[in-house]
Amino acid sequence: MSIYVIGDLHLPFGVNKPMDVFGEDVPNSENIKNANGEYIIPGSSIRGVLHAQMKKIEKYINKSGLVDKAFGYGGERAAEGKKGNLICNDTVIDCEKQMDVIRNRIHIDKFTGGVIHGHKFREKNVAGKVRFEFEIQDDGNADKTAALLLFALRDMAMGIINVGNGYATGKGFISNSTIIIESMGKVGMISKADIIYKDNENIEVSDNENVLAKVM
């Protein structure tokens, strides 16, 4: 089963790395890039936020073990661990015609709530079109993983959770999202359903083949 999320990263994303060059007009950090020089959202960042949200949903519906089956778990010995059935790769940010901005930031003392003197910094953030791609392996738990993932992606599409750091400063939120679910049938036919979020509030569902009913 494949699930895709297409949307606008309408506020700057927040996974940064230190710059290798210095200067007054050079930011202290910028978004992570891949070997091709493209800005990316690491798969580990996507997995991290989804793992946390799916864990909350699992607790809310009073179930256990669903997240472990999706993401896997470790053990003291290699034989005791188990890999999950949810695969998530890095996502390229298509920011060719979108925002590429340097922001001035300040450090806040978490104990006093005041500004730390001399800790002003500059970071380069980007925004643009994104397409998250998820593959769920058919191991007997694919439908349960898909259902839990769709609930978490719904929260992302509605602006309840963000990707990366910077939640408090409005970074990493997705808008105008379309969630696409593709399921392979027994005879090799692909069934498809679309969930469209307009302005993070108005929702349209296209599911003529009852794909959602099979996994929810």
Give the residues covered by each predicted segment.
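Small/polar/charged residue-enriched interaction surfaces, especially the RNA/DNA-contacting tracks
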Residues: 1-216
